[in-house]
Amino acid sequence: MKFKKTAACLAGLAFATGVVAKESNVGIFGTSGKGMGDHTYIAQDGPKADNIREVLSNVTLPEGFEINLYAIVPDARDMAMAPQGTALFVGTRKDKVWVISDRDRDGVADEVKDFAPSLTFDVPNGVQFTKDGFLYIAERNHVRLFPAAEYFFEGPDVVAVDI
């Protein structure tokens, strides 16, 4: 409980005072100041998806079980489902965090794109949500907090607070 109050106070303080993050490419309120930038999208169809589906069709499972391709995500390392189930965030050993959307909730990704392309990540292999919806991303040399990432992942420029 104390952690939740502390996290909420820190997030509120960051918004109220305009925290300037430690990185030189992150400005007031943790936005990059680079503008909106462009997302990188990963195609979920084509030869790569077909090859994966073919391999999966040869996997022997116990009766009543099935296996299907959910999403193609480059360099996937760690995953965290947003509290409301609207998006799955995926950390990597490279320089991107991916966000997967299954808007029609059919168990197949509708869209895979990079999260916060206006920011530079350094091995963001640890992603985790708190119960109250804060996304923490652990990188090689620091941790970032993204308040309400579940609701603002559609845009390329998001609020980020260095911890």
What does each of the following model-derived ranges do?
Residues K22-I163:
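Beta-propeller domains with acidic blade repeats across secreted/periplasmic ectodomains
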